[in-house]
From Swiss-Prot:
Function of the protein: Involved in bacteriochlorophyll biosynthesis; introduces a magnesium ion into protoporphyrin IX to yield Mg-protoporphyrin IX.
Residues binding ATP, per UniProt: 34-41
Keywords, sorted A to Z: ATP-binding, Bacteriochlorophyll biosynthesis, Chlorophyll biosynthesis, Ligase, Nucleotide-binding, Photosynthesis
Classification via Gene3D superfamilies: Magnesium chelatase subunit I, C-Terminal domain, P-loop containing nucleotide triphosphate hydrolases
Name of the gene: bchI
EC number: 6.6.1.1
Name of the protein in question: Magnesium-chelatase 38 kDa subunit
Length: 346
């Protein structure tokens, strides 16, 4: 049992970032940077327990839905044509997979037994961590210390939703759609800008310096450790309420729209901040849609954009060693200018 998500004190940026990625995984995951001991891994596991159980084919290592299973297995040469009624299912918690710092590419992506494939003609595939993470979370602690090549591979798979393993002319592919969560301490090293840009959102975690909140954190944790079952019973209604809000937002998301005027202001903001490429606009657009759905709104406004702009853009700003303005302040300042220009134009 994980510490309940709704009882985590503070760290609103991280909590919101995770929820938005659950509503729309196309946002592209979240990078959480901050000091150690601030609840990063606790929060990820806590959110997974809030989410409703998922249906998968019974015993399937890839956590596939019936539709995914039939599509993949029916495509195998010589395999019988399957119907949904032929496939047994089971309910499981949303998977949370930890990627250890020393993991190899084979451990992450999976391996093909070439000898067995050549001698028996069977594609002998040993699934990796990406298979286990399908339809869940892949959590990487100290992502800034992970090999750059491996981070590249993970980001490519997270973006495509598929893992492809190729060895000696043999190719295996399987679904690997997950929310990628990377965390780290900026004092131990930064990610390359090219990799930073690939994460959808960037949440900052700070050590809470409010005495009352620090006392509350200790009290809640001690109460939970002494009797987890009793503690969870106390907060079950808050947990259920959050679950309903997330499920409702997922259902509402396809109905959310955005006017061209809002999209124009988003593009103007990214230009004013000197954001390279177009990932900035794409991420803000998707995140604003998810945030609007979470609020129960069907039309994205610039107020929604204002709430999530920092999460989407702070890690995409060009770094100027002489600049003293905080990234969040810079985004807020330029956003105010854009909104002012929009009001004048109107």
């Amino acid at each position: 049992m994980a510490f309940p998500f709704t009882s985590i004190v503070g760290q609103e940026e991280m909590k919101l970032s995770l929820i938005l990625n659950i509503i729309d995984p196309r946002i592209g995951g979240v990078l959480v940077m901050g000091h150690r001991g601030t609840g990063k891994s606790t929060t990820v596991r806590a959110l997974a327990e809030v989410l409703p159980l998922i249906d998968r084919v019974k015993g399937d290592i890839y956590n596939r839905t019936v539709e995914q299973y039939i599509e993949m297995e029916s495509g195998v040469k010589g395999a019988p044509v399957l119907k949904a009624s032929d496939v047994k299912t089971e309910k499981i918690p949303v998977p949370v997979v930890d990627l250890p710092l020393g993991a190899t590419e084979d451990r992450v992506c999976g391996t093909i037994d070439i000898e067995k494939a050549l001698t028996s003609g069977v594609k002998a595939f040993e699934p990796g961590l990406l298979a286990q993470a399908n339809r869940g979370f892949l959590y990487i602690d100290e992502v800034n210390l992970l090999d750059d090549h491996l981070v590249d591979v993970l980001l490519d798979v997270a973006a495509s939703g598929k893992n492809v393993v190729e060895r000696e002319g043999i190719s295996i592919r399987h679904p690997a759609r997950f929310v990628l969560v990377g965390s780290g301490n900026p004092e131990e090293g930064e990610l390359r800008p090219q990799l930073l840009d690939r994460f959808g959102l960037h949440a900052r975690i700070i050590t809470i310096n409010d005495v009352a909140k620090r006392v509350e954190i200790v009290k809640l944790r001690r109460e939970y450790d002494e009797n987890p079952e009793a503690f969870l019973k106390k907060v079950v209604r808050q947990q259920q309420k959050l679950q309903k809000e997330i499920v409702a937002a997922q259902k509402l998301l396809p109905k959310v729209s955005m006017d061209d005027s809002v999209l124009t202001d988003i593009a103007r903001l990214c230009m004013a901040l000197g954001i390279d490429g177009h990932r900035g606009e794409l991420t803000i657009t998707r995140t604003a849609h998810a945030f609007a759905a979470l609020q129960g709104d069907t039309n994205v406004t610039m107020e929604h954009v204002r709430k999530i702009a920092g999460l989407c853009l702070r890690h995409r700003l060009r770094k100027d060693p002489l600049e003293t303005v905080d990234a969040g302040e810079k985004i807020d300042r330029e956003l105010a200018k854009v909104l002012g220009e929009a009001e004048v134009a109107a």
